[in-house]
């Protein structure tokens, strides 16, 4: 949430010549309402199920490469973690500091989990999800102090090298 997955993902997809898909967009399209509305009207559990369905629909049976940006909480589900690990050749974790996440998400009304104390929530979510990110990621990019262009360059370099990158 706020690490730059969508922004970086779009640029990486363009550079690679692959389609870009954001799982939140798939959820909104299928649900016929925004992610915020899904959370508010149907609850987080329903959103997570829709998110899992979206990830599965993008990854399973795909014959051509795609750049997929998932929500930061996609890793909560062991099914998602397994699916992503099995179906994706490169899984990039954009590792951002909580301070950076607070600044980046401050202006967005589309982040229902951040209603209230955003800094405390982001710290808690980051701590809860850390082991799952480490489990799934094949590439870890530290985004601290980096521009979007530098993050994209680091991602492309890591993909080309085919190795872990920090």
Which positions does each model-derived feature cover?
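Walker A/P-loop
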Residues: 6
